[in-house]
Amino acid sequence: MAAKFLLTILVTFAAVASLGMADNVLLSGQTLHADHSLQAGAYTLTIQNKCNLVKYQNGRQIWASNTDRRGSGCRLTLLSDGNLVIYDHNNNDVWGSACWGDNGKYALVLQKDGRFVIYGPVLWSLGPNGCRRVNGGITVAKDSTEPQHEDIKMVINN
């Protein structure tokens, strides 16, 4: 199950990288400018000109960053460290996800279930010889009773 999920994410990244920005994806280094949106099914994520990031379901507001009127000409940018930041027209940060990691390739995905999630580099993976460090992560010992599967990988989003 986890392997299929990871494969789906990897295929999505590959498709988006080759085609440019999808309607529901913002890649690291990309910016969503004022009054533009990501769209997935019934959900829309919009960065408003006055700096409010708002999620709508079927046109009805269901979440907001509560940063309305903290600037103008605002934009939403996914940084190369995975931090999602709202900047005003003077490049002042108005709001941030306050979650970041090592520099890498990240993707903000507005999913069809309405969640918006930042995906990024694998922090660790379990190979046939146990777990090994990835990106300076924690070394985790493999339980001897656990089956060995090269295809098990875990991404931790804090």
From Swiss-Prot:
GO terms for molecular function: carbohydrate binding. SMART domains: B_lectin. Residues 23-131 form the Bulb-type lectin domain. Residues 137-158 form a propeptide. Residues 1-22 form the signal peptide. Keywords: Disulfide bond, Lectin, Signal, Taste-modifying protein. Gene3D superfamilies: Bulb-type lectin domain. It comes from the Eukaryota. Disulfide bonds join 51-74. The keyword Acetylation does not apply. One of its GO terms (biological process) is response to other organism. Homodimer and heterodimer with curculin-2; Disulfide-linked. Taste-modifying protein; sweet-tasting. After curculin, water elicits a sweet taste, and sour substances induce a stronger sense of sweetness. This is Curculin-1. The lineage of its organism: Eukaryota, Viridiplantae, Streptophyta, Embryophyta, Tracheophyta. The gene is CUR09.
